[in-house]
């Protein structure tokens, strides 16, 4: 069996950097348990991935999309949770005043009115 070389794959992926990135990603997929699309023939995963690219059993566009998805970081965007202090402050403003506070305010008003008359 002839060994696969990079030259066999350059026809499919002209940029050698892209070829190396795609072959490395496919080799990691194989190592993770992805099914092979060519016979292994006692070759290691990087060689198998290059053979798959050369034989076009792995479409380059699909492989590129999978590689991009694997490199992307998913960030969840949720509404910020209100912290406990904000909740407490909001509850303080919405809460009706107790009768004691109302009577204190009323007494203070009466005292100020009485001082204003004198």
Swiss-Prot record:
Kindly give the Gene3D superfamilies that the UniProt entry links to this protein: 3.90.940.10
Domain of life assignment = Bacteria
Give GO MF terms, alphabetically: DNA binding; DNA-directed RNA polymerase activity
Specify whether Cytoplasm is a keyword of the entry.
no
Give the similarity note: Belongs to the RNA polymerase subunit omega family.
Query: PANTHER family this protein is in?
Result: DNA-DIRECTED RNA POLYMERASE SUBUNIT OMEGA
Spell out the subunit comment: The RNAP catalytic core consists of 2 alpha, 1 beta, 1 beta' and 1 omega subunit. When a sigma factor is associated with the core the holoenzyme is formed, which can initiate transcription.
List the keywords (alphabetical): DNA-directed RNA polymerase, Nucleotidyltransferase, Transcription, Transferase
**Reaction catalysed by this enzyme:** RNA(n) + a ribonucleoside 5'-triphosphate = RNA(n+1) + diphosphate
> Is Transcription regulation one of the keywords?
no
Q: Name one Pfam family in it.
A: RNA_pol_Rpb6
Give the protein's recorded name: DNA-directed RNA polymerase subunit omega
The residue ranges crossing the membrane are: none
* Function summary: Promotes RNA polymerase assembly. Latches the N- and C-terminal regions of the beta' subunit thereby facilitating its interaction with the beta and alpha subunits.
Q: Which NCBIfam families match?
A: rpoZ
- Mind telling me which GO cellular component terms the entry cites? DNA-directed RNA polymerase complex
Protein's GO biological process: DNA-templated transcription
EC numbers = 2.7.7.6
């Amino acid at each position: 069996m002839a060994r696969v070389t990079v030259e066999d794959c350059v026809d499919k992926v002209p940029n050698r950097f892209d070829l190396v990135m795609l072959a490395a990603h496919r080799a990691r997929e194989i190592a993770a348990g992805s099914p092979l699309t060519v016979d292994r023939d006692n070759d290691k995963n990087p060689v198998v991935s290059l053979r798959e690219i050369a034989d076009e059993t792995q479409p380059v566009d699909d492989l590129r999309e999978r590689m991009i998805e694997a490199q992307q970081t998913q960030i969840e965007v949720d509404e910020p949770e209100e912290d406990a202090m904000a909740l407490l402050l909001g509850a303080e403003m919405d809460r009706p005043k107790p009768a004691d506070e109302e009577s204190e305010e009323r007494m203070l008003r009466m005292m100020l009115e009485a001082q204003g008359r004198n």
